[in-house]
Amino acid sequence: MMGITYDTGALVAAEANRVDIWALHRDALRHEIRPVVPAAVLAQAWRGGPQHQLSRLLRGCKIEPMTEQLAREAGAACGAARTSDVVDATVVISALSRGDLVVTSDPGDLAHLADALNKPLRLHSV
């Protein structure tokens, strides 16, 4: 099994206690894969309340910090794709750097960013 990167839609699905994301997450952990959550994704999904299901999911994830290099690459990706969604761009750059599968509720926008970079990106919709 390859690495996995979660976008905001995956975190929202976990908080909604959707069976599909939990099955995928349990399978990843069973195969000793710790999904990556870019810090920008966490910021977009976190609303300050208890968010018990999201907190439970995050315990099995690695939070990837927003480094200067990642920020620059995400900004360049936004420019190439003519979009302003830096969170989506961060997900794409992050996943491409490792060859991860991206778990998303927004495959169209992520595919558009990857296409603008002429890079193949594996997507799984939730």
Predicted region positions:
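Acidic, PIN/NYN-like endoribonuclease modules and their adjacent C-terminal/linker elements
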Residues: 96-126
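Short, well-structured N-terminal submotif of metal-dependent ribonuclease cores
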Residues: 1-37, 46-59
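Acidic, metal-associated active-site segment
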Residues: 85-101
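Short, hinge-like loop/turn segments at secondary-structure boundaries
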Residues: 51-56, 81-82, 120-122
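Short beta-strand scaffold positions
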Residues: 37, 65, 86, 104-105
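General small-molecule cofactor/ligand-binding pocket signal
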Residues: 36, 64, 122-124
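Acidic catalytic patch
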Residues: 43, 61-81, 93, 107
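A general structural signal for well-ordered alpha-helical segments in protein cores
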Residues: 21, 42, 51-54, 71, ...
